């Protein structure tokens, strides 16, 4: 069900509903940690569950010559997978977050395609935070500066228009 419909239904019924937000676990922690956190919350009948998306971090490694090498690392990957696992296990709507920061339009398109294949049709489009090494938010060179641009990309994909300019016959499951 569309989250907007869930909210509108709660309003029309004058029923208080809530949702909770999950942080993907640190890389290396498995789904059991997520399920252990989610299990007691499901007894409270949440309207839906938000799954955050975290930007990449920068790890510095000092070389033998004293220079510094920078590595891009994702400490909390798994938003798409966690979203699918929670929806399947608990039969609750999930709202994975998609962010502009650290992702190209192509990365975002791939994530949206994966979400669609998994039957996940709600997303929360956000600009996202600046990276830890940035003074100000800097978009990916092939990405979006503002969340409204991300929303436009999502809307275009829903019309079958892809980043590479291809237009495909679109069906909505």
Stretches found by the model and what they are:
Residues 104-152:
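Flexible, glycine-rich active-site loops centered on histidine and acidic residues
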Residues 18-24, 47-51, 94-98, 123-125, ...:
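Hydrophobic faces of well-ordered beta-strands that scaffold small-molecule active sites
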Residues 63-96, 142-171:
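Alpha-helix-loop-beta-strand connector modules within alpha/beta enzyme cores
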Residues 25, 47-79, 131-139:
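Glycine-rich, proline-tolerant flexible connector loops at the mouths of alpha/beta enzymes
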């Amino acid at each position: 069900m569309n989250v907007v419909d869930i909210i509108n239904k709660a309003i029309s019924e004058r029923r208080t509903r809530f949702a909770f937000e999950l942080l993907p676990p640190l890389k290396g922690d498995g789904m059991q940690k997520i399920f252990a956190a989610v299990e007691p919350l499901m007894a409270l009948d949440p309207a839906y569950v938000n799954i955050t998306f975290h930007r990449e971090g920068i790890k510095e490694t000092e070389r033998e010559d004293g220079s510094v090498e920078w590595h891009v690392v994702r400490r909390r990957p798994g938003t798409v997978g966690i979203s699918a696992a929670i929806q399947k296990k608990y039969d609750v709507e999930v709202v994975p977050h998609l962010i502009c920061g650290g992702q190209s339009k192509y990365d975002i398109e791939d994530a949206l395609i994966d979400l669609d294949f998994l039957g996940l049709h709600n997303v929360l489009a956000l600009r996202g935070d600046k990276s830890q090494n940035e003074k100000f938010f800097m978009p990916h060179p092939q990405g979006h500066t503002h969340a409204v641009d991300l929303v436009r990309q999502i809307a275009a994909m829903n019309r079958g228009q892809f980043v590479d300019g291809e237009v495909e016959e679109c069906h909505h499951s």
